[in-house]
Amino acid sequence: MGLIVYSDQVRELMERTDEMVTAADIAPILGMKAETIIKKAKEKRWDRGVCNYIVSGTRVKFFRVDFLRKGGWIQ
């Protein structure tokens, strides 16, 4: 079962955060806890073709091009 965040939601988030998204920022959209997002990112459970990410402390950086090219984010 996949969870999709549509590009308009992501675009709005990116405009607010200038490409740097905290796990806390994206957690409400994904319906997940920030801690779970960080854990999954660190364990590299996400498909690299869908979302590239870098985890640094409690911040997760998502690359704008990947979000918008795919039309959203798929878990």
Label the predicted regions.
Residues 5, 52, 60, 74-75:
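Polar low-complexity intrinsically disordered regions enriched in Ser/Thr and small residues
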Residues 64-75:
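A short, Lys/Arg-enriched interface patch at domain edges and termini
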Residues 29-61:
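Major-groove DNA-recognition helix of helix-turn-helix-type DNA-binding domains
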Residues 9, 19-20, 48, 53, ...:
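Short linear motifs in intrinsically disordered/low-complexity regions
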Residues 21, 62-63:
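A broad, structural micro-motif
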Residues 18, 31, 45, 71-72:
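Short, flexible coil/linker elements and helix-boundary hinge sites characteristic
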